Amino acid sequence: MKEELLKRFTKYVKVDTQSNEESTVCPTTPGQMELANILVTELKEIGMQEVTVDEFGYVMATLPSNTTKEVPVIGFLAHLDTATDLTGKNVNPQVHENYDGKDIVLNKDLNVVLSPKQFPELANYKGKTLITTDGTTLLGADDKAGITEIMVAMNYLINHPEIKHGKIRVAFTPDEEIGRGPERFDVEAFGAKYAYTMDGGPLGELEYESFNAAGAKLTFNGNSVHPGTAKNKMINAVKMAMEFDAEIPKEEAPEYTDGYEGFYHLISLNGDVEQAKSYYIIRDFDHLKFVERKTHIASIAEKLAEKYGEGSVELKLNDQYYNMREKIEPVKEIVDIVSAAMRNLDIEPKISPIRGGTDGAQLSYKGLPTPNIFGGGENFHGKFEYVALESMVKATEVIIEVARLFEEKE
């Protein structure tokens, strides 16, 4: 299993599938369709049935039931794209066997070092096989580790018919990193009662709570006048944007919050005297607090518009996804089954809220309750991203055990 995981993973990460928020097509980048087509070929090769890919890059396939029991159809999902934070082009994975717990020099020329001083969790991986970047790109374990684990688990089940399971559906989706993954996902065609995204982090992670999420696009319209004659005439749009940001509680930012704490996050601010634009994301687990945060943003915009005049501040506020806990708690047994599967494999489940979003958050609201299971990676979205091969083995075993337990309980 280890060899197959390593071979598939290092192949998949070399395909540049970084998504692009500026694109209006789906998938937003051609590399995602390239990987989708590779996976279609490989799914057929291992013996999966009903293998399809649509024009938008959504891959679906079926592993038929091998039991006489009536077992609910379950699904496993992972996303094709990698994050926009750092390039995913020319990924050159480095394999470090029997990690010694010390610094790993990712790139000598650029002095990029993966160090336990900066990342103390590396101590957990002593003696393991780590797959890292070469210090110039992200790795793409988010979520090509998940893709790999699903592929290997399906191959294992096909080759071990003594493990009884119901019908299993798998899907690989585009553009998750920019929040568009579920937009064109056909829940009815997928046909599962429950599903799981293999999109979590370290060993044992199990998540069924996500943020409520919104985005706020602000445009500040100023009045540019020659600075020599600007008195009582100039309105500096950049300063308006700064004034707006000064009204946001400084301690309610990502760098000061964790656990169940929500935040406002200024993603970008650019412009000049005439016009400036800023973009915030708003996050909270509690729905009432989420509404309060959006109201606060709107009230600041209104206050500045009153001060600087009609048309001076434009706000576009849009909800992005909601806390999936509301949709999963009524069917909490799907979380309990994963916990049991992990314990059967000597993994301690680490149930915590996702300080982010997954496709599962939106899919849960489309009628497909979808918790999130660990994929094994650490330090996603950057050059220090890595994954332990042993964690990928465990994630693969969890998929197999979940399928077995669903059949066993019927």
Curated annotation (Swiss-Prot):
Keyword Hydrolase: yes
Active site: 81, 176
Residues bound to Zn(2+) 1: 79, 142, 199
Cofactor binding mode and count: Binds 2 Zn(2+) ions per subunit.
Gene3D superfamilies: 3.30.70.360, Zn peptidases (3.40.630.10)
Gene Ontology cellular-component terms listed: cytosol
EC class (word): hydrolase
Gene Ontology biological process terms, A to Z: peptide catabolic process; proteolysis
Binding site for Zn(2+) 2: 142, 177, 381
The entry's keywords: Aminopeptidase, Cytoplasm, Hydrolase, Metal-binding, Metalloprotease, Protease, Zinc
Gene Ontology MF annotations: metallopeptidase activity; tripeptide aminopeptidase activity; zinc ion binding
Cellular compartments annotated: Cytoplasm
Superkingdom to which the source organism belongs: Bacteria
Disulfide bonds: none
EC number: 3.4.11.4
Names of the cofactor(s): Zn(2+)
Claim: ATP-binding is one of the keywords in the record: no
Catalytic activity: Release of the N-terminal residue from a tripeptide
PROSITE patterns xrefs: ARGE_DAPE_CPG2_1, ARGE_DAPE_CPG2_2
UniProt family annotation: Belongs to the peptidase M20B family.
Annotated function: Cleaves the N-terminal amino acid of tripeptides.
HAMAP family, per the entry: Aminopeptidase_M20
Protein name, UniProt field: Peptidase T
Taxonomic placement: Bacteria, Bacillati, Bacillota, Bacilli, Bacillales
